[in-house]
Amino acid sequence: MAFVVPAEIGHAPYAGPLLEYMSGHFAFVQIAAVRRKLFPELSEDCWLLYADGFGGKTQHFLLSAIERFSFKDKPPDAGTRVPVAEWRMWHRRLRPFLLSADARGLYQEVARDSVRLGDVARVGIGYVTGANDFFHLRPSEAEQQGISGDLLHPAVRNGKALRGRAITWATVASWRRHDQPNFLLRLTDGRELPAAVRRYLDSQGGRDARTSYKCRNRTPWYVVPDVTEPDAFLSYMSGGTPCLVANQASCVATNSVHVVKLAEGQSITRLQRAWDTPFTQLSCEVEGHPLGGGLLKLEPGEAVRVVIGGKTDQRSAEDRLVQHAVSTMRQWRHYAEGSR
């Protein structure tokens, strides 16, 4: 049996049950990971899945990493032998096995004695308004509507706002100065609404907003739930390493970015310093997954597994191994220069 399959077979949650089934029903299972696109006109990467000996079982997969697809009358011979038990230890992901055995061994050794993001912080998604353009106002719009500034809260609407080390009050002032729609209409249940707000809610925009799925399924519809002021923000999708940006201006954020709340006694400065290490860059690649177009996606459940500032004893050979591993993972998601 042979299939062309999405490259998500190397990391997606649904790939785990599939490969468990394959290993329990076929004597031979091989996955050919193809780095260059099988279908160049599509954003989807594709790999090949081959299985033989139905009715048998296998204790390992064969993963063949090939640069480009070319027709052959049989699967490639060369490959990495991936024990099913070891695959399970990597959260049932094949992507880490694109790395060399030395890189995987070093990663496991360092990660075993290091802190992960989930040990020092909680990572979650931001709020969902149901109608972003209605609930986020420009300063000029709020003034025109007569909405008081104390009802508007500075908000990070997407990852483009995550620049530098911190979002500061100067950042928020720049949003105001450039009349950007980065101010959430933050209303609370039980508070009497000013006349200007009632008029805004009853405007055509408000009548349209309340019909959206999220709005019509909450009471009252105009109170956006789960609005928090985190210690930091983490980019959801990134080109290189995900950005970890301190929140020095008490901003809130939509679900286009992750919100990070530090555990008691933790310092965002120390966390950012550790976040910038090469090993943490590698960990983001290993624990995250490619989205397409060269992007790396980091779900909350993946983010908490990221190893923070893992030490490799500063040996040059290990440093080179980590750097090469980062480059390898980025090439496989088409981010590295010249990889397209």
Give the role of each language-model region.
Residues 339:
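Acidic, carboxylate-rich catalytic segments that either coordinate divalent cations
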